[in-house]
Amino acid sequence: MKKLFLLLAMLVALCSGVAGNISGWEAVPFIGMPKAYAFETKPVNFVVIDRTGSVTKADMRGWIQMVKMDYHVPYYGLMDDNTKAIAAVNDMFAKNPKPDKEAMKAAAEQAGCGALVVMVVHRMESYMVHSYGPFDDEIYVRTFAYADMFAYNSDGNKFIRRFLRETDFEPAGQDENPSDTIKWTLGNLLNKMEGKPQI
Protein backbone atom coordinates (compact mmCIF):
# COMPACT_ATOMS: atom_id res chain seq x y z
CA MET A 1 0.00 0.00 0.00
CA LYS A 2 2.90 2.33 0.79
CA LYS A 3 4.44 1.63 -2.63
CA LEU A 4 1.18 2.48 -4.38
CA PHE A 5 0.83 5.71 -2.40
CA LEU A 6 4.44 6.66 -3.19
CA LEU A 7 3.90 5.97 -6.91
CA LEU A 8 0.76 8.11 -6.99
CA ALA A 9 2.55 10.92 -5.13
CA MET A 10 5.38 10.86 -7.70
CA LEU A 11 2.94 10.95 -10.61
CA VAL A 12 1.09 13.92 -9.11
CA ALA A 13 4.39 15.71 -8.47
CA LEU A 14 5.59 15.15 -12.03
CA CYS A 15 2.30 16.18 -13.61
CA SER A 16 1.90 19.32 -11.49
CA GLY A 17 5.45 20.53 -12.00
CA VAL A 18 6.53 20.16 -8.36
CA ALA A 19 9.41 17.98 -9.45
CA GLY A 20 10.98 20.89 -11.31
CA ASN A 21 11.37 22.10 -14.85
CA ILE A 22 12.08 19.22 -17.23
CA SER A 23 12.00 21.27 -20.46
CA GLY A 24 15.77 20.98 -20.77
CA TRP A 25 15.47 17.20 -20.96
CA GLU A 26 12.94 17.19 -23.82
CA ALA A 27 15.62 17.37 -26.51
CA VAL A 28 17.65 14.54 -24.99
CA PRO A 29 16.48 11.15 -26.30
CA PHE A 30 16.32 8.22 -23.93
CA ILE A 31 18.73 5.38 -24.62
CA GLY A 32 17.19 2.95 -27.08
CA MET A 33 14.40 5.35 -28.08
CA PRO A 34 14.22 6.22 -31.80
CA LYS A 35 14.59 9.85 -32.78
CA ALA A 36 12.02 11.34 -35.16
CA TYR A 37 13.25 13.10 -38.29
CA ALA A 38 11.25 15.43 -40.50
CA PHE A 39 11.20 14.77 -44.24
CA GLU A 40 10.44 17.31 -46.91
CA THR A 41 7.61 15.70 -48.86
CA LYS A 42 7.76 16.76 -52.51
CA PRO A 43 4.47 16.90 -54.40
CA VAL A 44 4.09 14.60 -57.42
CA ASN A 45 1.48 14.99 -60.15
CA PHE A 46 0.40 12.21 -62.49
CA VAL A 47 -1.61 13.44 -65.47
CA VAL A 48 -3.31 11.00 -67.86
CA ILE A 49 -4.80 12.28 -71.10
CA ASP A 50 -7.23 9.69 -72.45
CA ARG A 51 -7.65 9.95 -76.23
CA THR A 52 -9.49 6.60 -76.34
CA GLY A 53 -12.36 7.25 -73.94
CA SER A 54 -11.94 3.73 -72.58
CA VAL A 55 -9.60 4.23 -69.59
CA THR A 56 -11.28 2.81 -66.49
CA LYS A 57 -10.72 3.32 -62.76
CA ALA A 58 -9.04 -0.10 -62.63
CA ASP A 59 -6.59 1.01 -65.34
CA MET A 60 -5.83 4.19 -63.39
CA ARG A 61 -5.25 2.23 -60.16
CA GLY A 62 -2.66 0.04 -61.89
CA TRP A 63 -0.85 3.02 -63.41
CA ILE A 64 -0.91 5.01 -60.16
CA GLN A 65 0.62 1.97 -58.45
CA MET A 66 3.62 2.24 -60.81
CA VAL A 67 4.03 5.97 -60.09
CA LYS A 68 3.83 5.37 -56.33
CA MET A 69 6.43 2.63 -56.62
CA ASP A 70 9.08 5.24 -57.49
CA TYR A 71 7.60 8.30 -55.80
CA HIS A 72 6.46 7.14 -52.38
CA VAL A 73 6.01 8.46 -48.84
CA PRO A 74 7.83 10.00 -46.94
CA TYR A 75 9.87 11.65 -49.71
CA TYR A 76 7.06 12.19 -52.22
CA GLY A 77 3.31 12.64 -52.01
CA LEU A 78 0.99 12.00 -54.96
CA MET A 79 -1.36 14.96 -55.26
CA ASP A 80 -5.11 14.40 -55.38
CA ASP A 81 -5.82 17.76 -57.00
CA ASN A 82 -4.41 17.85 -60.55
CA THR A 83 -6.05 21.14 -61.59
CA LYS A 84 -2.83 23.17 -61.85
CA ALA A 85 -0.92 20.25 -63.37
CA ILE A 86 -3.56 19.66 -66.07
CA ALA A 87 -3.50 23.35 -67.01
CA ALA A 88 0.31 23.28 -67.16
CA VAL A 89 0.34 20.11 -69.27
CA ASN A 90 -2.27 21.51 -71.68
CA ASP A 91 -0.14 24.65 -72.11
CA MET A 92 2.92 22.48 -72.69
CA PHE A 93 1.25 20.36 -75.38
CA ALA A 94 -0.15 23.48 -77.07
CA LYS A 95 3.42 24.69 -77.57
CA ASN A 96 5.08 21.34 -78.29
CA PRO A 97 3.30 18.01 -79.03
CA LYS A 98 6.51 16.09 -78.18
CA PRO A 99 7.84 17.93 -75.13
CA ASP A 100 11.51 17.83 -74.19
CA LYS A 101 13.25 18.21 -70.85
CA GLU A 102 12.92 22.01 -70.71
CA ALA A 103 9.20 21.89 -71.53
CA MET A 104 8.55 19.30 -68.80
CA LYS A 105 10.63 21.31 -66.32
CA ALA A 106 8.60 24.44 -67.07
CA ALA A 107 5.33 22.50 -66.72
CA ALA A 108 6.44 21.03 -63.38
CA GLU A 109 7.37 24.50 -62.10
CA GLN A 110 4.05 25.91 -63.31
CA ALA A 111 2.19 23.07 -61.58
CA GLY A 112 4.26 23.56 -58.41
CA CYS A 113 5.38 19.94 -58.12
CA GLY A 114 8.71 18.24 -57.56
CA ALA A 115 8.02 15.45 -60.05
CA LEU A 116 5.63 15.34 -62.99
CA VAL A 117 4.55 12.21 -64.86
CA VAL A 118 2.43 12.64 -68.00
CA MET A 119 0.87 9.91 -70.11
CA VAL A 120 -1.18 10.30 -73.28
CA VAL A 121 -3.13 7.13 -74.13
CA HIS A 122 -3.77 7.00 -77.90
CA ARG A 123 -5.00 3.43 -78.35
CA MET A 124 -5.77 0.67 -75.89
CA GLU A 125 -7.90 -2.15 -77.24
CA SER A 126 -8.05 -5.84 -77.97
CA TYR A 127 -10.32 -8.02 -80.07
CA MET A 128 -10.68 -11.70 -80.95
CA VAL A 129 -9.76 -13.11 -84.35
CA HIS A 130 -11.07 -16.51 -85.45
CA SER A 131 -8.91 -18.67 -87.66
CA TYR A 132 -10.72 -20.14 -90.65
CA GLY A 133 -7.97 -22.43 -91.90
CA PRO A 134 -8.80 -26.09 -92.57
CA PHE A 135 -6.36 -27.35 -89.92
CA ASP A 136 -6.40 -24.38 -87.55
CA ASP A 137 -9.41 -23.69 -85.36
CA GLU A 138 -7.58 -21.47 -82.85
CA ILE A 139 -8.92 -18.19 -81.51
CA TYR A 140 -6.39 -15.37 -81.43
CA VAL A 141 -6.38 -11.98 -79.72
CA ARG A 142 -4.99 -8.87 -81.37
CA THR A 143 -3.97 -6.14 -78.91
CA PHE A 144 -2.97 -2.50 -79.35
CA ALA A 145 -1.18 -0.45 -76.68
CA TYR A 146 -0.20 3.04 -77.86
CA ALA A 147 0.83 5.65 -75.29
CA ASP A 148 3.25 8.56 -74.99
CA MET A 149 4.97 8.77 -71.60
CA PHE A 150 6.95 11.68 -70.16
CA ALA A 151 8.51 12.04 -66.71
CA TYR A 152 10.49 14.80 -65.02
CA ASN A 153 11.99 14.93 -61.52
CA SER A 154 13.43 18.20 -60.22
CA ASP A 155 15.60 16.22 -57.80
CA GLY A 156 18.60 15.68 -60.07
CA ASN A 157 16.93 17.42 -63.04
CA LYS A 158 16.03 14.01 -64.54
CA PHE A 159 13.89 13.52 -67.64
CA ILE A 160 12.78 10.54 -69.71
CA ARG A 161 10.18 9.86 -72.39
CA ARG A 162 8.92 6.96 -74.44
CA PHE A 163 6.48 6.55 -77.31
CA LEU A 164 4.98 3.10 -76.83
CA ARG A 165 3.52 1.53 -79.99
CA GLU A 166 2.95 -2.15 -79.31
CA THR A 167 0.73 -4.40 -81.41
CA ASP A 168 0.49 -8.07 -80.55
CA PHE A 169 -1.22 -11.16 -81.97
CA GLU A 170 -1.36 -14.14 -79.59
CA PRO A 171 -3.51 -17.24 -79.02
CA ALA A 172 -6.40 -16.57 -76.64
CA GLY A 173 -5.26 -16.99 -73.05
CA GLN A 174 -1.67 -16.04 -73.84
CA ASP A 175 -2.39 -12.41 -74.63
CA GLU A 176 -1.55 -9.50 -72.33
CA ASN A 177 -4.13 -6.86 -71.51
CA PRO A 178 -3.10 -3.59 -73.24
CA SER A 179 -3.61 -1.75 -69.94
CA ASP A 180 -1.04 -4.05 -68.32
CA THR A 181 1.37 -3.51 -71.22
CA ILE A 182 1.14 0.24 -70.60
CA LYS A 183 1.42 -0.29 -66.84
CA TRP A 184 4.64 -2.33 -66.97
CA THR A 185 6.18 -0.02 -69.58
CA LEU A 186 5.44 3.00 -67.37
CA GLY A 187 6.93 1.25 -64.33
CA ASN A 188 10.11 0.30 -66.18
CA LEU A 189 10.42 3.78 -67.67
CA LEU A 190 10.27 5.45 -64.24
CA ASN A 191 12.64 2.84 -62.77
CA LYS A 192 15.12 3.52 -65.57
CA MET A 193 15.02 7.26 -64.92
CA GLU A 194 15.47 6.79 -61.17
CA GLY A 195 18.25 4.18 -61.58
CA LYS A 196 16.24 1.28 -60.17
CA PRO A 197 16.05 -2.33 -61.47
CA GLN A 198 13.61 -3.20 -64.24
CA ILE A 199 10.42 -5.08 -63.39
PLM feature spans:
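Hydrophobic alpha-helical membrane-insertion segments, chiefly the h-region
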Residues: 14-20
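Sec-dependent N-terminal signal peptides
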Residues: 4-13
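Short, P/G- and charge-enriched loop/turn segments at secondary-structure junctions
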Residues: 105, 133-139
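Single-residue recognition of alpha-helix boundary sites
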Residues: 13-14, 131
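Extracytoplasmic/secreted cell-surface and envelope-processing proteins
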Residues: 126-132
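C-terminal/domain-edge helix-coil "capping" segments
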Residues: 20-44, 110-111, 123-126, 137-199
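N-terminal segment of the mature soluble domain
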Residues: 39-122, 156-162, 189-196
